[in-house]
Amino acid sequence: MKLKASISTGFAALLLASCAGAPLVRAEPPAQVAPTDPAHRAIVQARLVADWQLAHMDGFDYVATFRDHTADPTGWIQSTFFIGLTALADATGDDRYVQAVIAHGERQDWGYGARPRHADDDAIGQAWLWAAARSTPSQREARLAATKVRLDAVLAAPSAAAMDFGDARGEQACQVRWCWSDALFMAPPLWAGLSAATGDSRYLTHMDGEFRATVEALYDPEAHLFYRDSRFIERRGSAGARIFWSRGNGWAYAGLARVLALMPADHPSRPYYLGLYRDMSRALIDAQGENGFWPVSLLEPGGPPETSGTGFFVYGLAWGVNAGLLTPAQARPAIDQGWAALSRSVGPDGRLGWVQQVGYAPDRVSAEDTQLYGAGAFLLAAAEVSQMESKRP
């Protein structure tokens, strides 16, 4: 389903080499940045967003819901921001951002949350691996130790739990595996990254099998999109359309890009992931709204702007152009409109708005809504857009 008639015209490298006042957030006009070249302008905005978020890491009274989850320093919400910060650190070479990630890791002793098999608690490990790639041999061992223990325990006793998500609230029995689309961002890049960092193929083999299980359970081969979890396979939206949540697909698409960035070029499973990535890319380009944002429910146009899903999609598309997997003709119009939409969502102080709050389905969103994972998605997108723009003729 095409929702628009027309659109206007290293994390991986490091690992492989190592084997609040009241803000004003407006949809229009764009946040004010210096009238420089587009590559630099993307980084200027990314710095603004990163600096605002780093200055607001206490209290979280500006977050509408789930403040306790937001305050968890190794939980998925903060993890996504720090993953984005690693991308900005790589793009800028700014030691402030490098040290912010390292200081966060040191405060947490490079450890994890209390759930040893829950993908949400895996996500922070991507920042730990990045920091390990920037360390001395002794530091590296310390920064990888908890990650090895965590993943080795899963290898020693892999789960065969069914992938069905229950209707009850709270954690589900299937969440010892990747039975919801968000998990594809949280966990697979950690497994692929540890394989790259250590040279141990067992981690990548496990990732491959579990990722395929999630695709089998949740991927719609006709729409080339993911259901958030098994509850949504038979559900329909108010207009009768299948429900493909924007951020849920953003998690999956960004995770897929990050896995491809880490997977060896000659790996026998790489063609499988390339096919999945290209099919999703085409579907997502078709689903983009006329305003540059992706709708909160991808097959239902209209609704409010939303920046977390849009950020992940711009990131994944721009990464594909930079990696030579998508042609500029295919993807740049969508990237350009998506990045313009994201830019319009940054307030003068750097606060990112229009971020749907913590949830599991399409929901309402307002200009004042912000969250750390939205900022993380923005930073990931900015780093790739800047690289893409630096190569534009």
Language-model regions, residue ranges each:
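Extended ligand-binding groove/face enriched in aromatic
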Residues: 98-102, 108-233, 238-240, 349
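CBM-like carbohydrate-recognition segments
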Residues: 32-79, 86, 91-98, 107, ...
